[in-house]
């Protein structure tokens, strides 16, 4: 239907400017997409009262979904970044034979490396509490996988607690406490089974597709 001002009208639904296609389904889809996308209307203007009421509701829904998606990505990627950083750091320690260094009688006590590793484990545990879905992210690169680095973390803890240097033993106990807390969280939150911290962490390693390889 042509109007005097050059527009056409879909009866009791929307107004169309001259040249716009007349398709019930296409126009309904168009209205929904531009509203959900918070883009605004161009050549289609709702005139039906119910459509005019529903349009801003759709716009609010679209804006809420967009905000939620951006917030989700903003939370997930920093958490994954911290976990990957810890994993790479542990692999670098393994590459440089840090367990053997801890076993030396003259091992240095002037660094806080084990404390920093324990603090990073605690951060990962908090991230898993706040963003439980990050547990299910698998890494294709083993050096960025916390599960792949877990056996060496346990070796670090054992070597530090067996050290003849009191300060290193204290740092080893701190590291083990962080691993114990992480294992408890794995057990209660994600149902990983085991009678000890080591068994639960080994379950985590296998759950992420890696082999359990620990020093004897």
Predicted regions and their residues:
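Outer-pore turret/helix-boundary of cation channels
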Residues: 1-30
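Short, solvent-exposed secondary-structure capping/transition elements
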Residues: 5-9, 66, 82, 162-167
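Residue-level marker of positions within ordered structural domains that often coincide
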Residues: 6, 34, 62, 78, ...
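Membrane-proximal helical linkers
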Residues: 16-17, 77-101
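Pore domain of cation channels
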Residues: 23-86
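Soluble C-terminal extramembrane regulatory/interaction domains of multi-pass membrane proteins
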Residues: 94-216
């Amino acid at each position: 239907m042509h109007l005097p001002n050059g527009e056409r009208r879909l009866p009791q639904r929307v107004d169309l400017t001259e040249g716009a296609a007349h398709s019930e389904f296409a126009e309904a889809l168009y209205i929904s997409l531009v509203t959900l996308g918070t883009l605004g209307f161009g050549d289609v203007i709702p005139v039906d009262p119910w459509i005019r009421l529903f349009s801003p509701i759709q716009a609010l829904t679209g804006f809420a979904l967009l905000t939620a998606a951006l917030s989700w990505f903003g939370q997930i990627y920093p958490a994954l970044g911290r976990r990957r950083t810890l994993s790479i750091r542990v692999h670098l320690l393994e590459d440089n034979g840090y367990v053997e260094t801890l076993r030396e009688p003259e091992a240095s006590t002037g660094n806080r490396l084990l404390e920093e590793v324990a603090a990073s484990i605690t951060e990962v545990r908090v991230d898993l509490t706040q963003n439980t879905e990050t547990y299910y992210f698998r890494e294709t690169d083993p050096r960025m996988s916390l599960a792949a680095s877990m056996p060496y973390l346990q070796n670090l803890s054992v070597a530090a607690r067996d050290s003849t240097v009191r300060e290193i033993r204290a740092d080893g106990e701190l590291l083990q406490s962080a691993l114990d807390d992480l294992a408890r969280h794995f057990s209660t939150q994600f149902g990983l089974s085991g009678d000890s911290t080591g068994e639960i962490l080994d379950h985590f390693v296998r759950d992420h597709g890696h082999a359990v390889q620990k020093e004897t």
